[in-house]
């Protein structure tokens, strides 16, 4: 993958992984009308962009995925041209305070955000199909998002080529 093409590819892969994991789907516990199957979770409770909880009408939990390619001048630099970049994957697990207890899964004593972060960590950490090398959990912190919403933010890091060694059909040059 080259340059920014990793962003959409990683987001799509993670969204697919989340909706196809029965433990994660059960932990989200989506009660929104019109959600018939796991595909319906996309852009209702699993987003590939950041989401403001106040734009949602239901007491629920949702997950957002963002991918960033931060500047890092010292990483494997070759004079002025960097060979590698270190994309970060930021996953926000946001729950309304009334949805924090995991009442729908017996024997789970963690709150919903902590439990989901454990499941996501197990699913992603150490995998080698995101860029080059293994994806690594760098941070997993808890915070609140204004009144009524609690958040757990997970940050993973991977490595990728800054420029492709060859052009594939998904990486067409923009003129």
Residue ranges and their predicted role:
Residues 1-81, 173-175:
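Small/polar-rich, solvent-exposed N-terminal microdomains that initiate assembly or binding
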Residues 78-85, 146:
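Short glycine/proline-enriched loop/turn "hinge" motifs that connect secondary-structure elements
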Residues 2-4, 151, 159-175:
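C-terminal tail/extension regions appended to the core domain(s) of diverse proteins
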Residues 105-109:
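Alpha-helix N-cap/helix-initiation motif
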Residues 66, 88-94, 155-159:
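Residue-level recognition of well-ordered beta-strand positions that form the cores
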Residues 9, 60, 86, 111, ...:
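Short, well-structured alpha-helical interface segments that form or flank functional binding sites
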Residues 84-104:
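Short acidic, glycine/tyrosine-flanked loop/strand segments centered on an H-E-D-like triad
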Residues 26, 30, 110-164:
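Acidic-leaning, charged glycine-interspersed low-complexity segments
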């Amino acid at each position: 993958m080259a340059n920014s093409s990793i962003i959409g590819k990683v987001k799509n892969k993670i969204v697919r992984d989340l909706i196809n994991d029965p433990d994660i789907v059960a932990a989200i516990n989506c009660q929104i009308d019109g959600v018939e199957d796991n595909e319906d979770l996309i852009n209702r409770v699993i987003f590939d962009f950041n989401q403001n909880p106040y734009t949602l009408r239901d007491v629920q939990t949702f997950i957002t995925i963002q991918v960033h390619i931060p500047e890092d001048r010292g990483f494997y630099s070759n004079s002025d041209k960097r060979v590698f970049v270190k994309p970060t994957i930021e996953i926000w697990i946001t729950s309304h305070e009334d949805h924090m207890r995991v009442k729908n899964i017996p024997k789970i004593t963690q709150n919903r955000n902590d439990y989901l972060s454990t499941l996501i960590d197990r699913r992603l950490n150490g995998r080698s199909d995101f860029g080059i090398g293994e994806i690594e959990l760098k941070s997993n912190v808890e915070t609140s998002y204004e009144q009524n919403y609690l958040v757990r933010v997970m940050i993973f890091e991977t490595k990728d080529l800054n420029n492709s060694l060859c052009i594939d059909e998904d990486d067409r040059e923009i003129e």
